[in-house]
């Protein structure tokens, strides 16, 4: 009753006058502060107050609009049962007692809210369009000096509340119609009645019974309305308690992407998404990690990154029990567990469990939008170019905690860790061989099936692995994108560059556990280990000769086929092995990169340096089982064994003479061809053997052996 009397006084009425029933106004649920109390609130408390007041107002308006749309105007037929909706908008009240320190921002928000019943317009009916328009005038011009410490309720009574629309809904039946006519005549601030028709089939909400004027039920139902979401999306069925939220939600359904990137033309639903996207072009990364200094373009990325340092994993999978640091990783894992692949390619019907995988599936378009500024190589994924850049920078961010070895990619580190654990979980069903990586097992399966999926477009040569095709392609086109920063030498493969770098550093990280011999390549170590076991699984189909390595068998096969695919561009000489061609190139260039630390003598081949070192150490590791004779070189032992067996594998095609060594055959062949490749730089005399040239040099130098 006190609240009702106060409301009547603010409207200039006496306490005993009748008021329209069933109307709950904003002031009835407003939280009130005096000016002194308001000054005691901090910014966060004021922001909270603003949100609560706006939410209350939206809920009240939702109730009011839904009630209004449930009524209709029926033209009078003289029977006295006409239903009329009267909408009165209170005129502005000029008042100088309101302070804009509290409600100014709330008022702006309220003025921006629009309530529209658009369904009626689509059906061709006249629809109620009640808009709360932004007002100009009194509230922004009020003087704080007149506000004093009066309660905000009193200040808002004459000014702020007059801006809020008071929508009075009455049902004219008997005496209620007379009350309506009387109340409207007594209210000087109410404008002319506006008749608005609604859909006839619209039913009145059951929340208030059959009588919309039953004000006694309204206070009890207030809490229900605060939670009510009366704005529903026709597409998804999702409900909202504010029309602005509904409109924002409907943008993706309508296809209205109004924010366009000026650089790439990409469209976005919201302005903040465009702002985040712009950082891709500007490379702006304002968010920095305090732990490692890494920067990010989005704050959410920084938040996810921090979990790497803290080790926090908040997202738990109910299927497999795995925990993840990011929700996106959990969603991906769930798709793997369920086998769900909801993202499908329209071209080839291939399905993916991630949207990003479908986006990266650019096989049909051939699109590669990401280009490396160093070598002009193009990529289909941004993540691929980021990892590619580490080749040029030499960055190796992934380090093994056991042996401190660093790697360019995380996959390399994961693969390396299995060396320490010796875990080989992938087993071949054909031969029982186990592998530490699934990709290795897949490649191994191709050896059994003879499958060669990767074919060269130039020469139609097929390969088992994609890396083999890439290597072959670079040989054909002569491309060498990998350059050594020390000597400027270029290579067709990154692995060759890494091996080459060990020449400058002298690094040999791979050590044999049996004899403690060290190697610069892992493949060399693996080959060496087979020497200890004596295992030779690779057998030649022509001569039944067995080899410890597949590469040795491949080299041997070329002896039978006579294939020499590697050709020198200088002298057109061909070779059966690439390594032979590389060594041959040094004959033309005069390069001798391998130097002895003892006597500073240089060599064009690493093997020659190793053999030379045995002169200083006196080491002779190769022993004949027949006579016990030892040798510095493996080739010397092989040739020696032929003395016991009498084998002479190398035969001259002209005179049928046979030799123990290939070098002896080459020397003999020069007798028939009269070739003299060894020339003296002093006098120009030529010789058919290197030893003859060396002997001739002593004439000029005066050296006596």
UniProtKB/Swiss-Prot annotation:
Key words of the record: DNA-binding, Isopeptide bond, Metal-binding, Nucleus, Repeat, Transcription, Transcription regulation, Ubl conjugation, Zinc, Zinc-finger
Entry-linked SMART domains: KRAB (SM00349), ZnF_C2H2 (SM00355)
Annotated GO CC locations: nucleus
Coiled coil region boundaries: none
Domain KRAB: 24-97
GO molecular function per UniProt: DNA-binding transcription factor activity, RNA polymerase II-specific; RNA polymerase II cis-regulatory region sequence-specific DNA binding; zinc ion binding
SUPFAM superfamilies: beta-beta-alpha zinc fingers, KRAB domain (Kruppel-associated box)
Superkingdom, taxonomy of origin: Eukaryota
Gene Ontology biological process: regulation of transcription by RNA polymerase II
PROSITE patterns the UniProt entry points to: KRAB, ZINC_FINGER_C2H2_1, ZINC_FINGER_C2H2_2
Localization, UniProt: Nucleus
Pfam families reported in the protein's UniProt record: KRAB (PF01352), zf-C2H2 (PF00096)
Residue intervals of every C2H2-type zinc finger in the record: 231-253, 259-281, 287-309, 315-337, 343-364, 370-392, 398-420, 426-448, 454-476, 482-504, 510-532, 538-560, 566-588, 594-616, 622-644, 650-672, 678-700
Main location: nucleus
Effect seen on changing residue 252 to I: Requires 2 nucleotide substitutions
InterPro entries for the chain: KRAB, KRAB_dom_sf, Znf_C2H2-type, Znf_C2H2_sf, Znf_C2H2_type
Annotated function: May be involved in transcriptional regulation.
Family membership noted in the UniProt record: Belongs to the krueppel C2H2-type zinc-finger protein family.
Protein name: Zinc finger protein 611
Organism whose genome encodes this protein: Homo sapiens (Human)
Gene name linked to the record: ZNF611
């Amino acid at each position: 009753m006190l609240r009702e009397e106060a409301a009547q006084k603010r409207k200039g009425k006496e306490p005993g006058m009748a008021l329209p029933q069933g109307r709950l106004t904003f002031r009835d649920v407003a939280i009130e502060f005096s000016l002194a109390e308001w000054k005691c609130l901090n910014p966060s408390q004021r922001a909270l107050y603003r949100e609560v007041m706006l939410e209350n107002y939206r809920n009240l308006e939702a109730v009011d609009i839904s009630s209004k749309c449930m009524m209709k105007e029926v033209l009078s037929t003289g029977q006295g049962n006409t239903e009329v909706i009267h909408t009165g908008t209170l005129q502005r009240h000029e008042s100088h007692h309101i302070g804009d320190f509290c409600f100014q921002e709330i008022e702006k928000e309220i003025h921006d809210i629009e309530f529209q019943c658009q369904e009626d317009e689509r059906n061709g009916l006249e629809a109620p369009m009640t808009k709360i328009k932004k007002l100009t005038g009194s509230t922004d011009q009020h003087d704080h000096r007149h506000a004093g410490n009066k309660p905000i309720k009193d200040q808002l009574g004459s000014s702020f509340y007059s801006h809020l629309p008071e929508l009075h809904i009455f049902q004219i039946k008997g005496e209620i119609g007379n009350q309506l006519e009387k109340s409207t005549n007594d209210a000087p601030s109410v404008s002319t009645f506006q008749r608005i028709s609604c859909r006839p089939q619209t039913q009145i909400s059951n929340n208030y019974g059959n009588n919309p004027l039953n004000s006694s039920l309204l206070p009890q139902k207030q809490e229900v309305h605060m939670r009510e979401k009366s704005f529903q999306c026709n597409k998804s069925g999702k409900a909202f308690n504010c029309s602005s939220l509904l409109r924002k939600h409907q943008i993706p359904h309508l296809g209205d992407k109004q924010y366009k990137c000026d650089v790439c033309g990409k469209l976005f639903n919201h302005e903040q998404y465009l702002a985040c996207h712009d950082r891709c072009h500007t490379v702006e990364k304002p968010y920095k990690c305090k732990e490692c200094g890494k920067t990010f373009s989005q704050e959410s990325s920084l938040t996810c990154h921090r979990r790497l340092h803290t080790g926090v994993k908040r997202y738990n999978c109910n299927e497999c029990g795995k925990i993840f640091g990011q929700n996106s990783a959990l969603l991906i894992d769930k798709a793997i567990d369920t086998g769900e692949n909801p993202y499908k390619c329209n071209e080839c019907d291939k399905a993916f469990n991630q949207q990003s995988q479908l986006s990266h599936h650019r096989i049909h378009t051939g699109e590669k939008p990401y280009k490396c500024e160093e070598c002009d190589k193009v990529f289909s994924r941004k993540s691929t170019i980021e990892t590619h850049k580490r080749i040029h920078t030499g960055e190796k961010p992934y380090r093994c905690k056991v042996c401190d070895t660093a790697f360019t990619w995380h996959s390399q580190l994961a693969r390396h860790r299995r060396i320490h654990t010796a875990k080989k979980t992938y087993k071949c069903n054909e031969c029982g061989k186990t592998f530490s990586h699934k990709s290795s097992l897949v490649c191994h399966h191709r050896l059994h099936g003879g499958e060669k999926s990767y074919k060269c477009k130039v020469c139609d040569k097929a390969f088992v692995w994609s890396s083999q095709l890439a290597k072959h392609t670079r040989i054909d086109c002569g491309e060498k994108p990998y350059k050594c920063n020390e000597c400027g030498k270029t290579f067709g493969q990154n692995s060759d560059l890494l091996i080459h770098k060990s020449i400058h550093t002298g690094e040999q990280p791979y050590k044999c556990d049996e004899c403690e011999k060290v190697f610069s390549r892992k493949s060399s170590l693996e080959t060496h280990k087979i020497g200890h076991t004596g295992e030779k699984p690779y057998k030649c189909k022509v001569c039944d000769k067995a080899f410890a390595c597949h590469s040795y068998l491949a080299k041997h096969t070329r002896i039978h086929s006579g294939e020499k695919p590697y050709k020198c561009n200088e002298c057109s000489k061909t070779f059966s092995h690439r390594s032979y061609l590389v060594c041959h190139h040094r004959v033309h260039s005069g390069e001798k990169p391998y130097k002895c630390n003892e006597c500073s003598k240089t060599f064009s081949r690493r093997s020659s340096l190793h053999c030379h070192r045995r002169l200083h150490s006196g080491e002779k590791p190769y022993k004949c089982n027949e006579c016990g004779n030892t040798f510095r070189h493996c080739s010397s032992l092989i040739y020696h064994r032929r003395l016991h067996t009498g084998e002479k594998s190398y035969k001259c095609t002209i005179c049928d003479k046979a030799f123990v060594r290939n070098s002896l055959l080459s020397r003999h062949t020069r007798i028939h061809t009269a070739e003299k490749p060894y020339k003296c730089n002093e006098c120009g005399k030529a010789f058919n053997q290197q030893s003859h040239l060396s002997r001739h040099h002593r004439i000029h130098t005066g050296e006596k052996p």
